[in-house]
Amino acid sequence: MTRLSLQLIAGLAGQAWLVNSDTPSHEAFASCLSDASVPIATKGTPEWTQHTTPFNTRLQYEPIAVAVPTEISQIAAAVTCAKKNSIPVTAKSGGHSFTSLGLGGEDGHLVIQLDRMYNVELAQNGTARIQSGARLGHVAVELYNQGKRALSHGYCPAVGVGGHAAHGGYGMVSRKYGLTLDWMKDATVVLHNGTIVYCSESEHSDLFWAIRGAGSSFGIVAEYGFETFPAPEKVTNFGIVLDWNPETAPAGLLAFQDFAQTMPSELSCQIDVRSTGYTLNGSYVGNEASLREALVPLLGKIGGHLEVHEGNWLEYVKFWAFGQPNIDITPPADNVHLSLYTTGALTPSLSANQFKSFADYIAKDAIKRGNSWSIQMFIHGGQNSAISGPKITDTAYAHRDKFLIFQFTDFVWPSQEYPEDGLALGREFRDIITNSFTNDQWGMYANVPDSQLSSGEAQKLYWGKNLERLETIKAKYDPSNLFRNPQSVKAAARCATHPLLLQGQCLLF
């Protein structure tokens, strides 16, 4: 037996969940990985802590092993070994999941750490090949430097493009350019049996539909093909500190919502709420003069002082980088770690009464928790939003008809114990926002998952009307549910007819 195989066995020996009559031995799994020359980290190896410390330290899970491929053949080999040994598989790109789903969301997964696969290559026709381990900041820098091109994506430069694009990809130019997944033209995917397939609108089109909104449930996306657009010459970022109190905030929020219904597509913005008060900030694709003109109908109604920062595309990306001096993030790279809880909602427009309840919650409940929480209310839709253009069924992303995105985050530093009341505080906020809507009127963004949802609740809220089709595609491409987490898409039941059964009945198998 090779030295690598012996090291793997030693690392796997402490994984008690493997020791049962239904699971092959540690030795079989270790030997398979060793024979395939898959780079692996196991418990006790120097890289283990870096690979397995989650962004959210409140939710810590222990993988059985972490594969660290540098090429797609190694991904396929690792998946094949896991399949043979009945071990669930999870992809981890940037590792920023709020619920540690990149580690499986539970113990015992083989994690495919993709961050060593981060190549970005721009073709002369403006299309780009981007490996799933690339961080958003690196993607932005490479596309700009290679050809002054850009891709619509979120604003945290350390987030990996793999999961970001697989479930949406909202950012501060999304109303102008749509979600990241809207620019996807193809993908290279490793399936449950180790097969490598190419999918697009014309090849494996059902799989291509599914990975644009629910990608992590269907395979390991090793590489994306994206269309890109010319990087805007000017993007103007802005902020307005709002002098609102509990009495004036509801009217201000309603005025902002009314303005957003018809605001130009070049404008993307959010209301940010913390213990220090309300702030409106965002970005405008264009120069400062055009931004000021666009905001004229709003400023007289909400008050506050406007501050602006005009720059080029990369300056826009740096502006939203939370003070990080380097946005061109490549491995080895570590993440900030927090102990946190997130929840949220995608909703239609809110009523005046709902905004009153929102403001009362801030003033009477959230403010008591000090300064560790934040709430963002993003404008998702509106008459001029590119996000709203496609139909709900055009991709697996099911929220094209929603107007607002809410995100609640409550955190402490990893050295502190997460407070018992934090979970309840977040759920109360979500209930205030959603309790006036029927279940089919609101949903949740899969890139802002809620750890407190059951599997059934999560699937319905993340994928809504598209869930049934996703379940059917799951049964076709991952019938054994190898790619899973506690909130992933589950395969539709397969059945076979039998002559003794009544019409419409079936035998499950």
Swiss-Prot record:
Pathway: Secondary metabolite biosynthesis; terpenoid biosynthesis. Its EC number is 1.1.1.-. It comes from the Eukaryota. Diterpenoid pyrones display various biological activities and subglutinol A shows insecticidal and anti-HIV activities. One of its GO terms (molecular function) is oxidoreductase activity. Keywords: FAD, Flavoprotein, Glycoprotein, Oxidoreductase, Signal. GO terms for biological process: terpenoid biosynthetic process. Glycans are attached at residues 125, 193, 281. Its cofactor is FAD. FAD-linked oxidoreductase; part of the gene cluster that mediates the biosynthesis of the diterpenoid pyrones subglutinols A and B. The first step of the pathway is the synthesis of the alpha-pyrone moiety by the polyketide synthase dpmaA via condensation of one acetyl-CoA starter unit with 3 malonyl-CoA units and 2 methylations. The alpha-pyrone is then combined with geranylgeranyl pyrophosphate (GGPP) formed by the GGPP synthase dpmaD through the action of the prenyltransferase dpmaC to yield a linear alpha-pyrone diterpenoid. Belongs to the oxygen-dependent FAD-linked oxidoreductase family. This is FAD-linked oxidoreductase dpmaF. It comes from Metarhizium anisopliae. The lineage of its organism: Eukaryota, Fungi, Dikarya, Ascomycota, Pezizomycotina.
